[in-house]
Amino acid sequence: MRTITTICLVRHGQTDWNALGKLQGQTDIPLNELGRIQARQCGEFLSKEASWDVIISSPLKRARETADIISHYIEVPVIEKMEFIEKNFGVAEGMTAAERASAFIDKEYPGQENQESLRSRLMNGLQDIQREYPEKKVILVAHGAVIHFILRLMSNESIVSNEMRLFNACLSTIRFEVDSWIIDDFNQVNHLS
């Protein structure tokens, strides 16, 4: 069986809003100093781990900055793809978990992107990667909800649940073999000190 495409999913480093527990969504918040350190640790680890062909990034600052820092270590181009922008959480963006729980008991946030829209754009993005980078090793820098959704889809929710939290700068690896995606590992943070 031959591996067609391998993707290392990297969640962006920490931002001030992450530190405060605020939901970011598509609000364009940059990395903080710890986030830049985490991105450097990702870059150092990934440079020793394998030979990479390309980095694909969400266009949001926190992901793009993480991707640019990683690129410094592995010297491959960074390509932005809108398909991997974070989920739009509507009016809940900027709110803490406590504020959201108080304001939206049912967790339905007015103006948020629906699951079908998110699934559709993420699957389109993954199919583009598969088509454009066959038999390549790809780093995809994205966001918590995006990576979580991809992992849930790939595992049929068998190993990744709704409640699982992805850490900033965590690494998860998926590969496409023959006609299906396989999760090799997820939410790894051993590279962070």
Predicted feature locations:
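Short glycine/proline- and acidic residue-enriched helix-loop micro-motifs
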Residues: 99-117
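Short, solvent-exposed aromatic-acidic interface loops
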Residues: 184-193
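Phosphate-coordination/substrate-recognition cap region in phosphate-metabolizing enzymes
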Residues: 41-103
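Domain-level recognition of soluble alpha/beta enzyme cores
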Residues: 158-182
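Generic beta-sheet signal
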Residues: 7, 136-144
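Loop-to-helix element that buttresses phosphate recognition and phosphoryl-transfer chemistry
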Residues: 7-65, 111-123
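Short active-site segment of divalent metal-dependent hydrolases/proteases
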Residues: 15, 146-147
